[in-house]
């Protein structure tokens, strides 16, 4: 089969598809991966065919509207309201470019930011993926609600948060989808979102661990929690400086904020993190972050293979993005999450409830004392360390990519005609 994996966004939106694409290729399939131009080197490093999709992952988090809004709080609705409206013709060009990236294949796998194009009823069969659990359930609140507790909340409340999130999401998408459909001679959708049926007629894959979040019993049969999709960088080697730093003392505290670094008050964040690590009698290791001089008990590296680095640390402080969270969970070390937006508060609440992460310190409420207290707990709590290690062992034993490949292949075998919409 020739399969297109289409995504937009930051590295965290692309690397899981690199893992999936590598797995599919190993099983004899041809794979093309659509991603923003800035992430082309990542796709090509994995030996996958690259196709361009729109987006500037670096530019988004430097937009003044984004920085100002996220420093106030993580709510998606506030962020969407703050963004300047895009011209209608721009929205349609984005959808057209995504559609073109998926041409000439037997099957398309859509990520959250590209699935809208599937509502134009293409002739190529498609299925979908989401990094966080966006299927309605009585079991837990909607990710988009920003709810910081995983329970005890009433099932009715949980369901209402999903209804509201679905309504708001469709409110943002509806006009551009109907314009897209209209240009293809298709009737418009009404007020009810067709995306609510993801996981009913075709697979809707969730590449997180069932050890972290089991599949709710009220989800449709075609919603699948596969396990994480890991891609460990082939041939990656640490620098001599990094190896020397790690060898020169006890495991350090790791601080990595991924693509959200620009949203933070970066120098202040580093200052707080250095102090927090010292309070736990540890050194600090940064991945990314601001350039500039650091004290002797801290080191900055521009990037790293987390599968190698994280198990060599005492605790990981991170933003709670899907990919970084997965790596930290598999590493089996305690965590401190600094949620910024989207799914970050959800994973922070979940890991806190599981006892593998200390109290989260949201960006909007960041202060020296709170970060120090959480880092100290993560480094010194022996029960948390045991729980984190056991969870890491369970996740490491899962076969997320293999599970996803089998599901894709089995469903594709049943497809001999074009799909039905929605």
From Swiss-Prot:
Function: Involved in the biosynthesis of the macrolide antibiotic tylosin derived from the polyketide lactone tylactone. Catalyzes the transfer of 6-deoxy-alpha-D-allose from dTDP-6-deoxy-alpha-D-allose to O-mycaminosyltylonolide (OMT) to yield demethyllactenocin.
Keyword entries, A-Z: Antibiotic biosynthesis, Glycosyltransferase, Transferase
Family named by the database record: Belongs to the glycosyltransferase 28 family.
Any one biological process term the GO annotation gives: carbohydrate metabolic process
Classification via SUPFAM superfamilies: UDP-Glycosyltransferase/glycogen phosphorylase
Organism encoding this protein: Streptomyces fradiae
Lineage: Bacteria, Bacillati, Actinomycetota, Actinomycetes, Kitasatosporales
Enzyme superclass (EC): transferase
Any GO MF annotation of the entry: UDP-glycosyltransferase activity
Pfam families found in the cross-reference section: EryCIII-like_C, Glyco_transf_28
UniProt xrefs under PANTHER family: STEROL 3-BETA-GLUCOSYLTRANSFERASE, STEROL 3-BETA-GLUCOSYLTRANSFERASE UGT80A2
EC code: 2.4.1.317
Catalytic activity of the protein: 5-O-beta-D-mycaminosyltylonolide + dTDP-6-deoxy-alpha-D-allose = demethyllactenocin + dTDP + H(+)
Consequences of knocking out this gene: Cells lacking this gene produce demycinosyl-tylosin.
The keyword Acetylation is assigned to this record: no
Name this protein carries in UniProt: O-mycaminosyltylonolide 6-deoxyallosyltransferase
Glycosyltransferase keyword on record: yes
Gene name of this polypeptide: tylN
